[in-house]
Amino acid sequence: MGKKAIQFGGGNIGRGFVAEFLHESGYEVVFIDVVPQVIESLNKNKSYEVTEISEEGEKTKTITNYRALSSKTQEPEVVKEIATADVVTCAVGPNILKFIAPVIAKGIDAREEGLPPIAVIACENAINATDALRGYIEEHLDKSRLDTLPKRARFANSAIDRIVPTQPEHAGLNVRIEKFYEWAVEQTPFGEYGHPDISAIHWVDHLEPYIERKLFTVNTGHATAAYYGYKAGKKTIHEAMAEETIHKAVHAALDETASLIISKHEITEQEQKEYVKTIISRISNPYLEDVVERVGRAPLRKLSRKERFIGPAAQLAERGMKFDALLGSIEKALQFQNVKGDDESTELAKILSEKTAAEATQQITGLETDHPLYQPVLKVVEKVQSVSK
């Protein structure tokens, strides 16, 4: 029997990043989704194209050997597929992990003895997303068999990095995506079984440096460009980065996060400098045509405690280091309100208009009132509220 991977989420990241590399490593991919049109389209079309974009030009790959099931209407079939699969991956968004956990738990419980444990890897823009998914899965597992879980499933955190820009209107299943990618995954959880054979993955012993470097450089920089760009009326990230004041604001924020990364991890100043240079070049890429509203969407998640702004700024504040530029990013993110098609931006506007500055600061950022970052952020919230009212 050939290798089989279950991919929760048939969206652009699922099709254009995860499934691309699973396909290239010889896996049959079974997509699991809840959107009928996505499932129908995947089952009707026996192939789709992934076009990698770079300054050198474009390269198109054809993806085949996949199927799709609905976790909403075909749960028994999904459970059977998981019970006989080698790998489960997901790209559904951190807030959706708790909803996919019950069916994964049923699939793990249905695995026959003697099969090697299934590899579970969450591919989300969040720190330790697989740990979070595992927690939700364990809530739904047969409690009498929890002690045998390591024989049935192994869970590994990952750090993913690839920009998927706004897609052309009638792209269908085809995905346009940047050529650059990084997919780092912990190898230690697999122990004596060894990690699955996925050639695109960079297997590492310690993931935190990769996760923090990526989240606090790529995501911090990308979102800073989006929020400054939105406020300045720019259409794309490329247009935003072409304006000197925005370019400087992004660079300043990344200088601050770089100082944290260098002081905390075994990454040299020169290494991080080169990494920042690469990231700024990537997000400035004119060929990606990345719309600021897409990159800025979900501001409440992006302003949360462990995320790309508050996360590094809080650690810098704890160390007595500079975080002024990040406060500027936070201010612009707070101004991303009532954006069409983005529920979180509407909710953000509601919180800022209805709550006191102290209530809003705690609800949005999760900062403790005695934290050294709390007062500076409170002042930013007060400033944004005074302008909004």
From Swiss-Prot:
UniProt keyword annotation of Transferase present: no
UniProt key word Oxidoreductase: yes
A biological process term (GO) from this entry: mannitol catabolic process
UniProt xrefs under InterPro entries: 6-PGluconate_DH-like_C_sf, 6PGD_dom2, Mannitol_1_phos_5_DH, Mannitol_DH, Mannitol_DH_C, Mannitol_DH_N, NAD(P)-bd_dom_sf
Alphabetical UniProt keywords: NAD, Oxidoreductase
Active-site residues per Swiss-Prot or TrEMBL entry: 214
Pfam families, per database record: Mannitol_dh (PF01232), Mannitol_dh_C (PF08125)
Domain of life, per lineage: Eukaryota
A GO CC annotation given for this chain: cytosol
The reaction(s) this protein catalyses: D-mannitol 1-phosphate + NAD(+) = beta-D-fructose 6-phosphate + NADH + H(+)
An annotated Gene Ontology molecular function: mannitol-1-phosphate 5-dehydrogenase activity
EC number, UniProt record: 1.1.1.17
Annotated NAD(+) binding sites: 5-16
Assembly notes: Monomer.
Function: Catalyzes the NAD(H)-dependent interconversion of D-fructose 6-phosphate and D-mannitol 1-phosphate in the mannitol metabolic pathway.
Family according to the record: Belongs to the mannitol dehydrogenase family.
Name recorded for this polypeptide: Mannitol-1-phosphate 5-dehydrogenase
Originating organism: Talaromyces marneffei (strain ATCC 18224 / CBS 334.59 / QM 7333) (Penicillium marneffei)
